[in-house]
Amino acid sequence: MKRLLFFLICVFFSKTSYSNVDISINKGIDISTPIGISSFEWVEVNENNNYENISKIISCDLQNSGKFSPIEIYKESNKSIEKQIKNNSINLNKLNINTILTGKISLNYNGEYLISYKLIDLVNYPGKILLSGYRTVHLQSFRKVAHEISNEIFKKLTGIQGVFHTRIAYILYNKNNEYKYKLCISDYDGYNQNIIHQSNMPLMSPSWSPDGKKIAYVTFEKGSSEIKIKDIKTGSIKHISSFPYHNGAPAFSPNGENLAFALSKTGSLNLYVMNLKNGYIKQITHGNSNNTEPSWFPDNNSLAYTSDQSGTPQIYKINISNGKFNRLSWLGSKNQNANVSPDGKFIAMVNSEKKSQHIALFDINMDNAKIITETFLDEAPSISPNNVMIIYTSSYGDSSVIELISTNGRFKTSILKINGQIKFPAWSQKI
């Protein structure tokens, strides 16, 4: 069994090495609410060519959500845009937008930058300021500030909390490096990448703690699989599980009190839950079928998981208190790797049919599913903490990509591209 598991892992990562990360934005596939984003105006100071373009970052954030279609307003328009609104002389039909964001950047006496911004209504109450604010920051914090402004705009216009400041985790593989496997975290859009752990042996399945301070993962550094939890800030590592055969698929409960995972110590893969305070482990599933890939529902008492008890992999739901379970997925021949949305209303999963493998969404209340991706060999969906976006991996020849798609299907983009393997993306759930 050890040899088989190691073979499967090698196949999973059996592509060429990766190079520098590339960030790219692709065209949307539907119409969203238009919003004007003007270039931030530099006031009484020459524009710093090394700064992060705040308006561009905000545009990308809002577009990634699938709820907005940003329209760039260039500098020559920006200088007079507020005056035109005030004088009611702006051509609304030409701009075709409901709101517009304007901003200014100036340098204060201690060398910090003052960034001010306004979100202005152009339709209901033309000229009314819907949102305004300012930040005093150093140059290296421009990207962070841009994400914060995006969050404010998104919340103001949709009523939904923005998550553009959140982070993702993933595994990189490069067979030519000293350390072939790297557990990394970055901003949700792929920027500011940091290596959290690296090894010559496989690393798999990162899972964030709800507070965003720790990551559970699977390692083979001692020759067989183990589950560990690493504190991101201190670097301390806590051992969780190293039973015979396979230890895998860790998943923190939403309240952070328990960790679900899969063990094959009795022969078949079954689900277990550990109380992280006292270390007590409870077996959840039983029998000869393979049960793995747990994902928590927000009630902290139910899990979605993959089981082959019907003959092919399908998604099931189980109550961890009484053991009652039922099948959820019926789309096509195979469904696996479920990720339950934070609000518990839908599940993202991998659907396989003949030679295709795509991400599908299963609406729990409506009891129906639909395929939302068209990329190649789509895997490992992870839903944003506000239920608006999904990241997943796909393959393009020898390259591996983290894709982002809005749950409404209106926009998709590639956020991380490498010439090699990138696997197991996981979106932090801390807002």
Curated annotation (Swiss-Prot):
Principal place of residence: periplasm
Pfam families referenced in this protein's UniProt entry, alphabetically: PD40, TolB_N
Subcellular location: Periplasm
Keywords noted in UniProt: Cell cycle, Cell division, Periplasm, Signal
Residues of the signal peptide: 1-19
One Gene Ontology cellular component annotation held by this UniProt entry: periplasmic space
One Gene Ontology biological process: cell division
Statement: the UniProt record of this protein carries the keyword Oxidoreductase: no
Keyword Metal-binding included in the entry's annotation: no
Quaternary structure and interacting proteins, as annotated: The Tol-Pal system is composed of five core proteins: the inner membrane proteins TolA, TolQ and TolR, the periplasmic protein TolB and the outer membrane protein Pal. They form a network linking the inner and outer membranes and the peptidoglycan layer.
HAMAP family tied to this protein: TolB
UniProt similarity note: Belongs to the TolB family.
PANTHER family xref list: PROTEIN TOLB, PROTEIN TOLB HOMOLOG
Function text: Part of the Tol-Pal system, which plays a role in outer membrane invagination during cell division and is important for maintaining outer membrane integrity. TolB occupies a key intermediary position in the Tol-Pal system because it communicates directly with both membrane-embedded components, Pal in the outer membrane and TolA in the inner membrane.
NCBIfam families per the UniProt record, alphabetical: propeller_TolB
Designated name of the protein: Tol-Pal system protein TolB
Species of provenance: Wigglesworthia glossinidia brevipalpis
